[in-house]
């Protein structure tokens, strides 16, 4: 006891002070934490004592902030490094023990470990004598505790070493209580800055005088005293504990200092701040206020340490004469000390009063009053220190804080034995930090605080702070924020370092670190009713800083990356004749700044495809797919307009292939491709809409009095300006497509009016309103107008791929497309999650990685382009059909060709330009007459003829051209369609527009299951289109071109292609490169071809009938052909003698067998006989010779029989020729054969001669 040095009162209370802002330069950097001296305002030095816990009172809900004593400059890293190098004789609070020599430079300074309550840490070996560290206290939860990182230490006025070393108390071994009293009496007592923070309406502070700088230096001095019996830091630690928790009355004198040291630590986020932060404006404001109060005190406190305790108290009260004593301004601890301190009976008894201002509680709306607390420290003879903190009732002149408004607090004892407590009620703790901790006004900090508080267990955390407790409208907050914006530059550090420098209570997380935390929760009613004595342990205060996840970095990079492409500026001066109305600034993209002259261009800009961005929006609770950055930003802007901030939990960014970049953008409207059409789904009957929206009108004008143009919609009874606006009304596309699909024909209609008009088509009910243009038609002409003029049934339901936007006509095609283009099949290993493209790779993997496992086949898994994986194929198919209704899109198919269009006007323009339409009634009549004979198909049904229009009464007023219009109309009605479209049910005679609907109709209505491709002309159906085409070609094709062999005498085969015929002639007849010009015939299913009969009947008689010109033409052509042709060369002649004299030159020798009919040579007679039998249909050479003689008789016999009808029936591929059909032969040609009288006298040989002539004489023709 005797050799224990007691700290001076001035030095003790100087720890509550803050530096002089007049000597601070906000632009200079504070020395880094690695330097020996540390700035008291440096936020990066705040640390946590992980090994000490605090004693704390109050229940968790009522204590929004723990009692945290924060020193802004302490080095957590250095502390941990020095943890094992502490002198054994140092006291717990940093005071030197009696076994250490006094140090004039350090005995009066409070070490950072002492200030922060670090009981086992010291940095005296690293502190230079000329550098001292000022000690700001109670700054953890106020803006003054968060200086900007660039405030230097040397410019704060703390580097000036003054006469404070003289006032450092010496270490007399026997007198401890006296020096402590003297130190307390001489210590300058500034305002408690924790409560200065809550002075919202203080007058503007004035600059500090020079004396305040010295006083601040004194507050920055740190003391390292030996540790033997006296633990003097507990006194100061208790005062800090009180300020942190004003509701706690100290009655136990032992356990507070160890926990208090931990409470003064700082979140890791503050420790990690760089050394270039700047002084907050709140620091300057509050320091200036403090300097006025202690200006006169410092002058008298500096000379020595032997002054009376009453002196500083009185002078301190005089040092701040201008400070207001309003309920909203904090009261100085000097006043409390002057009013409440009384000399103790024991020299080791120290009493001091302190007052502070607490922030309003959550429910309190009135400004809080300043509580008064008495701190009593008693040093017993056994070396123990007892401290008691009790609340003093407010003064009568302080009406802002009544006892009813201040719920009773609790008393904390710090000694093993109970200490006598002072009378009075204790002040609650929760009001003091709820506002101070969140005063920075950072919503990000508030959110982090909420998250941290949620992580804290209820039993270990008495602190519950939410962002809703942030006071708004605070003058001090606004002043601090303005000055911070003007002085502190924005840093380029991550978001955590961009937070305000004030220590946010919302950023503190309370978790027990090294000492078990025990919290005694008390209800608010008990706290407000009576003072209570409670012992508790406050957990460490720190913040668990989590690095931003990668998804956030990627998302921020996508959102905030600069646009490398320069802004696009359009030409906003279109030609005058274009009739395009362009805004003055064009249509501007709010995301990237590009401008466009047309609104459609802007929509295409938003729908461009440049990157694949898949985001799971937490606000929408669904996964969204974007193909460019602008569409993503527009979605985020939509949330921002509602006051929300877009957040994502999943993000997938990947490039897209070049073939998917330029696919057609999905079009949701069937209206013309104009900006006004897409922007105004419901055109109003105004001149602007009528001129800007051009609907798809009928292909050609209808005949007179068959349709009636109206201006009123028969469905919604809305009046329109003209028929064009009415057509636009029926063709507009609504966003809601639910209930617009016809259940009969599965057609997707654009809107409700068009849907109702379409339903009446199936019901055959009037009024007969066209669903496309809205005109009213007569029932007889209605189907023709709808099918052919307005092309209503060209509407098809398409299915758009959600991955690439390609539209398919059927779901089966869409499924095949997704499986081929957007799905991948992998072979998964049976023992691990690895999957490979091929089964062999999986096998190799199993062999190398799982050699001990039994062999198992790989499992097929299916991966969709949306990154979902399925282990069964049916699951991925179900995945495809989940949102089928959302993928439907209206398309238009040309009835003449397989082209598809996304907009109706494009289809109409294509039909006009490519296929042609009549422009008037006369042209319509000519078109009908030209298509009457060629378009008559079995499945086509001509509409009924409408009743004739009575125009005779108006004959005088009609022109000559108008008289024929009813007849032209009848012809137009009677003419069949240019192309047979759709299917007609043979049972109910219902016409169905598309194939899928026909198959569905047959199954639902008649119970017949058809295959996928039914035939229009019969009831057969097929699985694939090639089988259907073959069926139509063989059974229903009206014009079929066949190739028949002319060398075959009987049952000549026909071939569909000339190549097959050429092969046949080469193989069967031995003729290479035959002339096929006369072998193609046109065969009609209903009757035989005249040319086929001509081949079978080369000789025909002559007839004078004019209707048989075809037979005469064929006969004339035949007469010019030679009868004998050499098969070895190109020689041909009509003379048999000349032919017989020609062929011997091709005979190699006399022993070679040669055919006398074609000149071919064979090695043996058997081969020749086989040739004669197969080719010439003769048994042997002699029979062939007889055939030649019989050929010579044919011509005169046919001439003799001229003028008579020959009745013959010949079958050609199953086709019969009428027996009475006359065959005409032109005898005007030259006769190639001489008349033989003998053969003419034998008419019985005529049939045989005719047959022989067909087999032999026709050979040269082919």
From Swiss-Prot:
Glycyl lysine isopeptide (Lys-Gly) (interchain with G-Cter in SUMO2) cross-link, chain position(s): 200, 204, 546
Highest taxon above the source species: Eukaryota
GO cellular component terms, semicolon-separated: nucleus
Record keywords: DNA-binding, Isopeptide bond, Metal-binding, Nucleus, Phosphoprotein, Repeat, Transcription, Transcription regulation, Ubl conjugation, Zinc, Zinc-finger
Localization in the cell: Nucleus
Biased composition (Low complexity): 343-367, 484-494, 924-935
SUPFAM superfamilies from the UniProt entry: beta-beta-alpha zinc fingers
C2H2-type zinc-finger residues: 587-612, 615-639, 711-731, 740-764, 768-790, 799-822, 827-850, 892-915, 983-1006, 1013-1036, 1043-1069, 1124-1146, 1153-1176
A single GO molecular function term of this UniProt record: PH domain binding
Compositional bias annotation for Polar residues: 454-463, 1241-1262
Modification Phosphoserine, positions: 78, 142, 145-146, 529, 573, 691, 1089, 1198, 1202
The UniProt record lists the keyword Methyltransferase: no
One Pfam family named in its UniProt record: zf-C2H2_ZNF592
GO biological process terms on file: negative regulation of insulin receptor signaling pathway
Basic and acidic residues bias: start-end ranges: 213-232, 298-308, 964-976
InterPro entries per UniProt: Zn532-like (IPR045914), Znf-C2H2_11 (IPR041697), Znf_C2H2_sf (IPR036236), Znf_C2H2_type (IPR013087)
Region (Disordered): 23-45, 122-174, 200-278, 294-494, 924-979, 1222-1262
Tissue expression profile of the protein: Expressed in the brain.
Annotated function: May be involved in transcriptional regulation.
Family: Belongs to the krueppel C2H2-type zinc-finger protein family.
Assembly description: Interacts with ZMYND8.
Name recorded for this polypeptide: Zinc finger protein 592
Gene that this sequence comes from: Znf592
């Amino acid at each position: 006891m005797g050799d224990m040095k007691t700290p001076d009162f001035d030095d003790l209370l100087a720890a509550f002070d803050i530096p002089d802002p007049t000597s601070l330069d906000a632009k200079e950097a504070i020395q880094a934490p690695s330097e020996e001296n540390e700035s008291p305002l440096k936020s990066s030095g705040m640390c946590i004592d992980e090994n000490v816990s605090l004693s704390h009172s109050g229940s968790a809900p009522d204590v929004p902030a723990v009692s945290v004593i924060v020193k802004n400059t302490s080095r957590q890293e250095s502390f941990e490094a020095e943890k094992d190098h502490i002198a054994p004789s140092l006291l717990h609070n940093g005071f030197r023990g009696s076994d250490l020599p006094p140090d004039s430079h350090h005995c009066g300074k409070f070490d950072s470990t002492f200030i922060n309550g670090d009981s086992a840490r010291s940095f005296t070996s690293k502190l230079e004598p000329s550098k001292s560290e000022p000690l700001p206290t109670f700054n953890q939860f106020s803006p003054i505790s968060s200086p900007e990182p660039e405030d230097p230490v040397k410019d704060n006025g703390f580097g000036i070493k003054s006469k404070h070393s003289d006032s450092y108390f010496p270490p007399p071994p026997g007198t401890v209580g006296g020096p402590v009293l003297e130190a307390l009496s001489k210590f300058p007592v500034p305002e408690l800055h924790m409560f200065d923070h809550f002075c919202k309406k203080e007058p503007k502070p004035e600059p500090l005088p020079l004396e305040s700088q010295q006083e601040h230096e004194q507050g920055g001095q740190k003391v390292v005293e030996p540790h033997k019996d006296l633990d003097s830091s507990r006194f100061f630690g208790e005062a800090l504990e009180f300020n942190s928790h004003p509701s706690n009355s100290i009655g136990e004198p032992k356990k507070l200092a160890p926990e208090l040291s931990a409470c003064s630590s700082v979140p890791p986020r503050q420790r990690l701040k760089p050394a270039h932060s700047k002084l907050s404006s709140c620091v300057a404001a509050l320091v200036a206020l403090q300097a006025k109060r202690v200006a006169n005190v410092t002058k008298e406190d500096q000379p020595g340490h032997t002054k009376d305790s009453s002196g500083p108290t009185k002078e301190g009260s005089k040092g701040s004469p201008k400070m207001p004593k309003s309920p909203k301004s904090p009261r100085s601890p000097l006043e409390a000390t002057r009013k409440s301190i009384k000399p103790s009976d024991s020299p080791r008894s120290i009493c001091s009063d302190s007052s502070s201002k607490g922030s309003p509680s959550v429910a309190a709306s009135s400004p809080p009053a300043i509580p008064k607390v008495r701190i009593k420290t008693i040093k017993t003879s056994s070396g123990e220190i007892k401290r008691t903190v009790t609340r003093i009732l407010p003064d009568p002149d302080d009406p802002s804080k009544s006892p009813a408004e201040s719920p009773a607090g609790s008393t904390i004892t710090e000694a093993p034995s109970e200490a006598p407590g002072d009378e009075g009620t204790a002040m609650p703790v929760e009001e003091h930090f709820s506002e101070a901790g969140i005063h920075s006004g950072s919503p990000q900090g508030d959110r982090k605080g909420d998250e941290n508080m949620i992580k804290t267990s209820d039993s270990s955390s008495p602190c519950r702070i939410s962002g809703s407790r942030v006071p708004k409208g605070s003058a001090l907050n606004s002043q601090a924020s303005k000055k911070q914006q003007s002085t502190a530059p924005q840093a380029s550090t991550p978001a955590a370092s961009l937070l305000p420098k004030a220590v946010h209570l919302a950023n503190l997380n309370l978790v027990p670190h090294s000492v078990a935390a025990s919290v005694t929760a008390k209800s608010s009613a008990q706290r407000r009713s009576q003072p209570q004595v409670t012992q508790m342990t406050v957990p460490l205060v720190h913040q668990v800083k989590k690095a931003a996840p990668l998804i956030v970095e990627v998302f921020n990079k996508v959102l905030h990356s600069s646009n490398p492409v320069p802004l696009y500026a359009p030409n906003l001066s279109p030609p005058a004749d274009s009739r395009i109305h362009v805004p003055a600034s064009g249509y501007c993209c709010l995301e990237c700044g590009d401008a466009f002259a047309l609104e459609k261009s802007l929509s295409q800009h938003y729908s461009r495809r440049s990157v694949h961005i898949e985001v799971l929006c937490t606000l929408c609770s669904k996964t969204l797919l974007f193909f460019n950055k602008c569409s993503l930003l527009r979605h985020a802007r939509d949330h921002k307009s509602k006051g929300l901030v877009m957040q994502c939990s999943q993000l997938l960014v990947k490039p897209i292939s070049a073939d998917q970049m330029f696919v057609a953008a999905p079009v949701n409207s069937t209206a013309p491709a104009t900006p006004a059409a897409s922007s105004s789904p419901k055109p109003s009957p105004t001149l602007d809409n009528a001129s800007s929206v051009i609907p798809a009108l009928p292909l050609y004008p209808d005949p007179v009095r068959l349709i009636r143009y109206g201006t009123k919609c028969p469905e919604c009874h809305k009046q329109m300006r003209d028929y064009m606006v009415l057509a636009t009304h029926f063709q507009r596309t609504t966003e809601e497509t639910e209930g617009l699909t016809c259940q009969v024909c599965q057609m997707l209609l654009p809107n409700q009016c068009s849907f109702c008009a379409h339903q009446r088509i199936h019901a055959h009910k009037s009024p007969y309103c066209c669903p496309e243009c809205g005109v009213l038609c007569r029932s007889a002409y209605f189907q023709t107008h709808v099918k052919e003029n307005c092309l209503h049934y060209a509407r098809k339901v398409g299915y758009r791929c959600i991955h690439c936007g390609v539209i398919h006509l059927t779901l089966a095609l869409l499924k095949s497309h997704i499986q081929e283009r957007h799905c991948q099949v992998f072979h998964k290993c049976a023992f691990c999650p690895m999957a490979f493209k091929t089964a062999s790779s999986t096998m190799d993997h199993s062999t190398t990685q799982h050699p001990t496992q039994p062999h198992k086949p790989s499992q097929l898994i299916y991966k969709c382009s949306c990154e979902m994986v399925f282990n069964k194929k049916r699951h991925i198919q179900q995945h495809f059909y989940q949102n089928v209704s959302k993928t439907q899109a209206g398309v238009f198919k040309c009835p003449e060709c397989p082209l598809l269009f996304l907009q109706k006007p494009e289809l109409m323009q294509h039909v006009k330009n490519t296929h042609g339409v009549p422009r008037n009634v006369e042209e319509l009549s000519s078109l009908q007459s030209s298509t009457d004979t060629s378009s008559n198909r079995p499945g086509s049904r001509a509409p009924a003829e409408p009743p004739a229009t009575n125009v005779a009464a108006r004959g005088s007023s009609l022109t000559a051209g108008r008289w024929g219009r009813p007849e032209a109309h009848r012809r137009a009605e009677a003419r069949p369609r240019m192309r047979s479209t759709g299917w007609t049910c043979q049972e109910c005679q219902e016409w169905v527009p598309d194939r899928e609907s026909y198959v569905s109709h047959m199954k639902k209505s008649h119970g017949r299951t058809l295959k996928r491709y039914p035939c229009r002309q019969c009831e057969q159906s097929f699985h694939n289109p090639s089988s259907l085409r073959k069926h139509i070609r063989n059974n229903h094709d009206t014009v079929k071109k066949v190739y028949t062999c002319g060398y075959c005498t009987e049952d000549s085969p026909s071939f569909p292609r000339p190549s097959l015929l050429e092969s046949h002639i080469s193989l069967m007849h031995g003729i290479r490169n035959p002339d096929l010009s006369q072998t193609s015939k046109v065969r009609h299913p209903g009757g035989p071809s005249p040319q086929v009969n001509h081949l079978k009947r080369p000789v025909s008689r002559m007839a004078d009938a004019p209707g048989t010109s075809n037979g005469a033409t064929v006969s004339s052509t035949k007469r010019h052909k030679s009868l004998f042709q050499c098969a070895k060369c190109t020689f041909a002649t009509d003379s048999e003698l000349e032919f017989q004299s020609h062929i011997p030159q091709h005979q190699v020798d006399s022993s070679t067998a040669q055919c006398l009919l074609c000149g071919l040579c064979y090695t043996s007679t058997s081969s020749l006989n086989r040739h004669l039998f197969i080719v010439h249909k003769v048994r042997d050479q002699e029979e062939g010779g007889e055939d030649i003689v019989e050929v010579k008789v044919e011509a005169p016999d046919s001439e003799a029989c001229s003028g008579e009808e020959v009745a013959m029936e010949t079958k050609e591929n199953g086709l019969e020729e009428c027996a009475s059909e006359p065959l005409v032969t032109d005898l005007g040609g030259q006769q190639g054969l001489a008349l033989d009288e003998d053969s003419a006298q034998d008419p019985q040989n005529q049939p045989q001669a005719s047959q022989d002539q067909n087999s032999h004489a026709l050979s040269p023709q082919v």
